[in-house]
Amino acid sequence: MPKVSIIVPVYNVEKYLEKCLNSLINQTLKDIEIIIVNDGSTDHSIEIINKYLEKYPNIIKYLYKENGGLSSARNYGMPYAKGEYMAFLDSDDYVEPNMYEEMYEIAQKENSDMVECDFIWEYPNKKRYDNGIIYNGKEEAIEKARVVAWNKLIKREIIEKTKIEFPFGLRYEDVEFFYKLVPYLNKISFVKKYFIHYVQRNNSIIATQNSKTKDIFKVFENVIEYYKNNGYYEQYKEQIEYSYVRLLLCSSLKRMCKIGNKEDRKQALEETWNNINCNFPNWKKNKLLKNKGLKNVYLRTMNQYTYKIYCSILSII
């Protein structure tokens, strides 16, 4: 059994794919499997994949499917994973050579259900180092974790037993996947090293703001429904409420303000405020808002009047 299975969805990334695959082939942890899921690419990605398949047939599995998006490709690859731990890597990103060895060693040492590392936002002309908070327990995971999937090593049996998948056709797929997993993560560990280069492209999903930005509403609706149906909601309600409000009024709101179509932008901003106050009418009383930090100061000052002011400011910066 491989130690780590790495699922790599591929869609029209011929400019980036070799760097991504080289970073995986050259891992110091040798007992890995790389599962490439070709999500219906129409560029020269397949020629690059075939070159690596021919050279490394023992560690690369190749799967093809019709185009369905990032979540669909990840979900398609998961049943083929045989490793003790599972990881995800987007095919325009790349990793440091010792990443999976060091994360796997910590997982073994601490019997971890999940291991998380830090990463670098890599822009054409600059880099930004993302140094995450070390959080303790499930409550803090919901409250403080970076919800991206690709900086984590996750025990495969947890994913298999829970049957948790990425939501089809929605942005913010990592948000739903991570929050659904949290109740089953009894031990979370950290490697405080910048292992992943998170490459920023102008035409990437995250860089393009449109009406799909509103998918965050459906994603959190799915999370809340899952927690209620599985008996976790009352236990984690405070954290879910706080994370919902923080995400919608911070990073998500900034994206909403950048929606190009004026009517779509106006509707998205109205829906954001209405959704928050409909789902959590007493959110201003959430005890987690009392914690220190600039984001909490910002959230505590938020009301129906300041909301419009903040939206106006975010639209022009």
PLM feature spans:
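Nucleotide-sugar donor-binding/catalytic module of glycosyltransferases
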Residues: M1-E221, E225
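Structural motif
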Residues: E234-Y244, L289-K292, V297
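Generic hydrophobic, helix-prone segments enriched in Leu/Val/Ile
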Residues: I6, Y85, E110, I216, ...
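Short, hydrophobic secondary-structure boundary micro-motifs
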Residues: D130-N131, Y236, K284-N286
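Membrane-interface aromatic/basic loop that binds lipid-linked glycans or pyrophosphate carriers
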Residues: I259-I317
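Short, surface-exposed helix-loop/turn micro-motifs enriched in polar/charged residues
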Residues: E102, G169-L170, Y233-I240
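Catalytic core of nucleotide-sugar-dependent glycosyltransferases
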Residues: F195-R201, A207-Q235, L247-P281
